[in-house]
Amino acid sequence: MGKIQKIYIVIPAFNEAGSIGKVIEDLFYYGYENIVVVDDASADKTSETVKTFNVFLIRHPVNMGPGAAIKTGIDFALFDGADIIVTFDADGQHLAKDIYNLVQPIILNESEITLGNRFLNKTSKVPIFKKIILKAGALLMFLMYGILSSDSHNGLKAMSRSAALKINIRSNGWEYCSEVIEEIMLKKIKYREIPVTVKYTDYSIKKGQKIYNSFYIFSKMFIKWIFG
């Protein structure tokens, strides 16, 4: 029998006092205890809420962006001995029960990274404007890197320790998701897409990326690809 894998859940959070408590409770319910919340200098009571739970809390002194928060969380998880790292959103869009299917291919040594894909699961009722943006992003990723992923900007991912050590996240903003895809291609990391459910509520839609932010991200990706 192989050793039990230490699974760490990394949650970047910015002004998520309204949802982070329920997110942590759901993760506990499904047996995930190694939870790392990175509070990216929230102005609300995100940190105060997190402190009521037995989880790791790291707080950035200034707001740096989701990419920076993810990098901070991954670095801490690696330092603390994680075998598998799962990145998970703080706004309640992701389901804790989906983590099992994400980590199984890694535990079985079938993949080094698994990418959650909401379009492979019919239960995800994706708003039409969001679907258009995500499909446009997928096309851009394919043209730039040759990887066809219809949901490259889904924050629900899992990676082995070895993959986490290979991945170099340089961007502080949302474009870090595209960097992960780029790193998979450049470093020939074995990956698989896994069907997951993404829940859309008024809260999560309000908190999510705005259309102008998405176009800004796409333009930065394209400029980076052209000029390196």
Map each language-model feature to its residues.
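Cell-envelope/extracellular polymer assembly enzymes that use nucleotide-activated donors
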Residues: 6-8
